[in-house]
Amino acid sequence: MRLFDKIVDKMVSEKVPRKRRRRLIIYIAVITLLSMTTATVAWFSVNTFAGVQNLDLHISMSAQLKVAMEDYGTDLEKYGKVITNEMIDEYLQKQNTRLADIVLDPVTTRAGDVFTNQRGAERVPNKRSYLEFECYFIATEEMWVHLTTESTKQGEDDGTKVTTTSTGAKADVVNCARVGFTTAENGTAIYEPNRGTPVNGQATFDLPGGAMVYTDNTRIFHIEQLKPTKVTIRLWIDGEDPQCDDDVQDAQLGVQLGFIGCDENNVPIS
């Protein structure tokens, strides 16, 4: 209302006739109301955000592919097959936060490395915007790393999937989530679960709903033999996605990522 007061004061000082002044004020009020009601199409209009419930990474036991939160060079004993919430929390401690405190305020991106909000302002990670952390993959032979929906070991259900415990319309949060994987060699690959029409010029991929089939589209990065490869992983809610509306506010998101190594013909390495 301060804006209207300033306008009125200015019109009074400039001796604008009272009748014309009333018309101008009503016109300005209508325009402002329209801008408020049409500003939000897909983006949240109220910032109560979505939260990250869990985020786990699992690697197939068959191929000699391992991962760690730090670069341990070629000391394979210090790498493992799993990255847990607790390990991600240790990384986030450097930024005075933890996974349980991460909230996903809608952002969008074209290439998966620079993120902006609805007003076009650039956002930084892990600050009520999007989640970002780094990890290092290493393999005993050259390979392409793929996402997989298959369980990484027998008897487990740890393949790639994005889930929610939220119900009703909030469950649509799984449709507007994105996960990006960035390396110096291969750039960024963006996984879009339940992929729809691409938004904001993004090049994304989805995984098959049935039996897993490995193709060039499921590749996320390449690894040289015994060369630690830094991978930046980002999780965000894309505000340009049609499902990213007020219905999914306060939803909880769970992300499980399964990785497998394949040869140049996309055949899993045993």
What are these regions (language model features)?
Residues 111-158, 201-270:
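C-terminal, structured domain-capping segment
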Residues 41-43, 51, 68-72, 93, ...:
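A composition-driven signal for long, intrinsically disordered, charge-rich low-complexity tracts
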Residues 36, 48, 99-198:
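Surface-exposed interaction patch
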Residues 16-18, 42, 157, 174, ...:
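Short, structured coil/loop segments at alpha-helix boundaries
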Residues 3, 9-98, 249-253, 261-270:
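Short, polar/proline-rich extracytoplasmic segments that appear immediately after membrane translocation
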Residues 9-20, 85-124, 187-228, 234:
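Extracellular adhesion/glycan-binding regions together with long Ser/Thr-
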Residues 57, 67, 135, 179-181, ...:
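Generic structural hydrophobic/aromatic packing signal, biased to beta-strands
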Residues 49, 62-64, 74, 88, ...:
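Generic "edge-of-domain/loop-turn" microfeature
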